[in-house]
Amino acid sequence: MKNKVVVVTGVPGVGGTTVTQKAMDILSEEGLNYKMVNFGSAMFDVANEEGLASDRDQMRKLDPETQKRIQKMAGRKIAEMAKESPVAVDTHSTVKTPKGYLPGLPAWVLTELNPDIVIVVETDGDEILMRRLSDESRKRDLETTASIEEHQFMNRAAAMSYGVLTGATVKIVKNKNGLVDKAVEELISVLR
């Protein structure tokens, strides 16, 4: 029997991983145990095993065909996990590459995952820019507020297309500065 598959997306620095992890912790205390899977980590495991990337941020620079092959392999691994328990897939709706936006969940991954819900975590572009500038643990390309907002627009468009292709609902969750608990509660209400 298929368990619920929820995809949580957002641009780098929006706080999607933080919001999702906090929600998972609260739901676990209530007895609802999702397996949280980071799609980028699953892809990195494949890329690293093949000697293609030594850190996650290098994967964005791989050629599109290599990225697509890695996505497909990671999607298969995650789909197998959903047979055992509900899964929350932490990923990006789109990945900004030097050659344009790459869908984070192309048709071959969507077919495997068949998500029930696609969640897009967002906030204002200037808040994301400030978060990125203060995060010294990642090697991110410098972007403007306008380019971050364009990326968020592309994420919404991609999320809706994922919903059209799978029948999944699409939910926007706002993660404003200082209001992470509100974002967590909104996410929990969708995951229950």
From Swiss-Prot:
InterPro entries registered for this protein in UniProt: Adenylate_kinase_AdkA, P-loop_NTPase
Main localization (coarse): cytoplasm
Gene3D superfamilies reported in the protein's UniProt record: P-loop containing nucleotide triphosphate hydrolases (3.40.50.300)
Superkingdom of this protein's organism: Archaea
Subcellular location per the Swiss-Prot or TrEMBL entry: Cytoplasm
One cellular component (GO) term of this entry: cytoplasm
Binding site for ATP: G10, V11, P12, G13, V14, G15, G16, T17, T18
EC number per UniProt: 2.7.4.3
Entry keyword set: ATP-binding, Cytoplasm, Kinase, Nucleotide-binding, Transferase
Statement: the UniProt record of this protein carries the keyword Cytoplasm: yes
Reactions this protein catalyses: AMP + ATP = 2 ADP
One annotated GO molecular function: adenylate kinase activity
UniProt subunit comment: Monomer.
Family to which the UniProt record says this protein belongs: Belongs to the archaeal adenylate kinase family.
Protein name: Adenylate kinase
Phylogenetic placement of the source organism: Archaea, Methanobacteriati, Methanobacteriota, Methanomada group, Methanococci
